[in-house]
Amino acid sequence: MQQMTDVSKGDQSKDGQGKGDQNKDSAVNYHHGNLRLALLDATVAQIKEVGVEKLSLRGIARIAGVSQTAPYRHFKDKNELLAEVATQAFIDLYQATSQQLTPQRTTCKNIEATALAYVDFAIANPERYKLMFGPSIQNRRSYSNMLAAGERSFNVLISQVEHGIEEGIFLNDCAMILANTLWTQVHGIASLIIDGFYQNRELPMPFDEFLRIQISIASRAIQINPTAYTASRIANKTDRQVRFD
């Protein structure tokens, strides 16, 4: 496989000496195709450093250790680069949630497992998660790969809702509407967590259980005959207050 090297060469001066020669020690060698992945990682790193509003291709190149022109070999502008970061994030989210599905679980338990994996992904990847669903990417409809990856990740939930409808567990309604009802609940919880809403707040139980109960209650909204769920289960645990830090 052809090897591609990006060195911060800088502009050539009249005597032929490259202005970037002083940076040769920081040059990074990439096999063909790896530069693209390195730029995606560098993008997330710079978002953590300065925020998406101050993101620049020059800063991304600096973090990746390549020339300032290197990002343009793969992406025409910052927006296209952000769309690609989101695309990869949707792919990773699909893998994180779909691997939770198993025939040994009931449909409701599969939904609970995928929902927890969804929240875990958001907590582990707050910058990418906000990019996936936030307003930073312009003209989102122009990026077919990103849209397809997003649909695929959402279809993990839709497929389970369809199973529930076929089994007579869920309301016999549009699967997309029912799935969206569940997703908005889980997405809202994930967003509150990564925005710090639960930091230093006292909860009536360990946070993992707090989260599971919310997801379980949310799934009952689309069930035909949801099992009884009373507040006593929560009330009995009020002596185990913890903080989510």
Can you name each region flagged by the protein language model?
Residues 1-11, 15, 20, 154-155, ...:
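C-terminal peripheral helix-coil segments that are non-catalytic and often amphipathic
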Residues 35-43, 60, 85-89, 93, ...:
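Generic hydrophobic, amphipathic alpha-helix propensity
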Residues 38, 49-80, 84:
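Helix-turn-helix
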Residues 88-112, 142-151, 160-166:
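Amphipathic alpha-helical linker/stalk segments
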Residues 98-128, 172, 176-182, 229, ...:
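Hydrophobic alpha-helical connector segments
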Residues 112-133, 155, 183-190, 194, ...:
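Helical hydrophobic small-molecule/effector-binding pocket
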Residues 127-159, 177, 200-204:
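Short secondary-structure transition hinges
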